[in-house]
């Protein structure tokens, strides 16, 4: 996970080697393969962006912005469009500096997502990052459904030198969070990180469990800054969008951790997510 706040595009580039190469290679072929900026040029460009999983909506917005700038600046040569295109993509992916306020406030960060996306690893890395910034961190191991989830998280907590509160396998996750919230308040913790079960979006009872956790935090820790991060696997492409949509119906999602960015040639999903939902990708995992 990239931890430095260098602006989303810079962090994205670090985690997107394969994707960037493929998309840029495709874009370069358009710029070198056309001698005029016409409908065919824009069509080819759209196709390459969509193939890179940037998605139809984001691609349309990017290309429309490019057309507008080409007209305003009276550009005739396709080669002169490249930087404009990069700027147009950047505009779709801006993350405001206030998006990271939760790192500085007394906060509760709930981390959600389906199984297998790298959720527990993300919690562990985030705990280590915050600890390195001299924040007092506590982890709540509320994934009590999956065998060994607690052990895996305990290993990450130990590595980060951060205390953890967890329940036995099968314990009520909301009660684990209740205990963790009270411990956080008693110990003067800066950041409480809550790891949740891999809530498969077709399991209604698991979604209800998430709502219960939400209510416990709201009731017991009302003055804490709330941050709900969803972990999405970039290799699942457009399927990540449907996962986000399902979880959005259950809780307010404030940011995204996008994992496995080097395992896919279609990391353009990062652009699609932000353009479609306006939810910033705050961390990149590889």
Which ranges hold each PLM region?
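Non-catalytic terminal/linker segments enriched in charged/polar, low-complexity residues
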Residues: 1-98, 104-111, 128, 132, ...
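P-loop/Walker A NTP-binding module and the surrounding RecA-like catalytic core of P-loop NTPases
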Residues: 90-286
């Amino acid at each position: 996970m990239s931890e430095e706040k260098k602006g989303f595009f810079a962090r994205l580039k670090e985690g997107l080697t394969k994707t960037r190469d493929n998309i840029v290679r495709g874009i370069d072929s358009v710029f070198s393969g056309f001698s005029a900026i016409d409908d065919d040029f824009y069509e080819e460009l759209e196709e390459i962006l969509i193939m890179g999983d940037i998605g139809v909506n984001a691609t349309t917005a990017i290309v429309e912005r490019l057309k507008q700038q080409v007209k305003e600046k009276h550009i005739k040569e396709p080669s002169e469009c490249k930087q404009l295109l990069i700027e147009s993509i950047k505009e779709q992916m801006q993350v405001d500096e206030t998006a990271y306020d939760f790192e500085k406030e007394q906060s509760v960060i709930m981390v959600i997502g389906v199984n297998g996306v790298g959720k527990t690893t993300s919690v562990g890395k985030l705990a280590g990052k915050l600890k390195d910034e001299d924040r007092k961190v506590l982890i709540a191991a509320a994934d009590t459904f999956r065998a060994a989830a607690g052990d895996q998280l305990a290993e990450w907590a130990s590595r980060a030198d951060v205390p953890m509160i967890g329940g036995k396998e099968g314990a009520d996750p909301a009660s684990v969070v209740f205990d963790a919230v009270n411990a956080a308040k008693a110990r003067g913790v800066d950041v409480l990180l809550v790891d949740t079960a891999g809530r498969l979006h077709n399991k209604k009872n698991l979604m209800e469990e998430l709502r219960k956790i939400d209510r416990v935090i709201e009731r017991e820790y009302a003055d804490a800054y709330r941050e709900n991060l969803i972990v999405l696997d970039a290799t699942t492409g457009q399927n990540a969008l449907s996962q986000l949509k399902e979880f959005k119906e259950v809780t307010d999602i404030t940011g995204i951790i996008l994992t496995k960015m080097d395992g896919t040639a279609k990391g353009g999903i990062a652009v699609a997510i932000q353009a479609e939902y306006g939810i910033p990708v705050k961390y990149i995992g590889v």
